[in-house]
Design a protein with these regions (language model features):
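Phosphate/pyrophosphate- and phosphate-bearing ligand-binding catalytic cores of soluble enzymes
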Residues: 4, 8-16, 55, 149-273
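Anion-binding (especially nucleotide phosphate/pyrophosphate-binding) glycine-rich loop
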Residues: 1-135, 143-145
């Protein structure tokens, strides 16, 4: 394998002028081993990118830049849940459509999030009361330090609110994600934007979530942006009850019993939208 010089201006959400001198597409573990050998010989670090929808690209990448082309879907319909392995290069919303068409449930609240499947576990993407970690069984990775493939279980991924082990470990390249999905429609509708709706199937939920998102955040293809990248602040119920001004804000119950406040609404009220 040989690198190519590549212009990346149209490969990031902000459409920033950017280029890489050493760029590789990869589709297999063997590809990654060859790329790693090249990087070591050139004394270069390795930087992985996805669709660039949640990143600020530099004008010039001096290190080796890689991107997955693994668009594979592997389905195993056994047991109470359906196991689905998805390649890192699959566009997230294409996965949502795949699940709707196959009658696989659980990810509907996460519809409309830009990016790829490989990026989803990194910050444990979430929206409208749901997180991807609730459906992850394992993540297949390539370890740049050992030059070997490794499988991390859900617990080994150390998922938290918008965080995971992948934010701490630069040596792990996500190759594919193993999901465990529901066989019946059990929507989470406790978020204010959804609680007044009634849905008969996942397709209706997905369409509604996409419509809500489109009203709030423009498509990066139409207006360059990084989407919703901030965290909603979380406080205890006791703190929430003590401050009556907080009751004027949108709030949601967290799974651990705390109260989550809407950072987006706070920014709107401060005139920082």
């Amino acid at each position: 394998m040989s690198p190519e010089a590549k212009i990346l201006t149209n490969d990031n959400g902000l459409h920033l002028k950017s280029e890489a001198k050493y760029f590789f597409d990869f589709n297999s573990i063997d590809d990654l081993k060859k790329i790693t050998d090249f990087a070591k010989k050139e004394n270069k670090s390795i930087q992985i990118i996805g669709s660039g929808t949640n990143a600020i690209f530099p004008e010039y990448f001096s290190d080796v830049v890689i991107r997955s082309t693994n668009n594979d879907f592997t389905l195993d319909d056994a047991g109470d849940r359906v196991s689905l392995s998805v390649g890192a290069a699959v566009v997230w919303d294409d996965l949502i459509d795949f699940c709707v068409n196959k009658g696989l449930f659980g990810l509907g609240n996460l519809a409309g999030i830009p990016g790829t499947v490989g990026a989803a576990p990194v910050q444990n993407i979430g929206a409208y009361g749901e997180e991807i970690s609730n459906f992850i069984d394992h993540v297949e990775c390539f370890d740049l330090d050992t030059n070997n493939q490794v499988r991390l279980s859900k617990s080994e991924c150390k998922f938290g609110y918008r965080k995971s082990i992948f934010q701490e470990s630069d040596n792990l390249i996500i190759v594919s994600v193993g999901l465990s999905l529901l066989k019946k429609f059990e929507p989470k509708l406790h978020y204010q934007d959804l609680k007044d709706h009634s849905f008969t199937d996942e397709g209706e939920l997905v369409e509604t979530v996409r419509n809500i998102r489109n009203k709030k955040i423009p498509d990066p293809k139409d207006f360059p942006n990084l989407g919703s990248f901030f965290k909603n602040p979380t406080i205890t119920k006791e703190e929430y009850e003590k401050n009556s001004k907080l009751h004027e804000l949108k709030s949601y119950d967290s799974d651990n019993g705390d109260i989550k406040l809407s950072a987006g609404e706070m920014l709107d009220k401060l005139g920082l939208k």
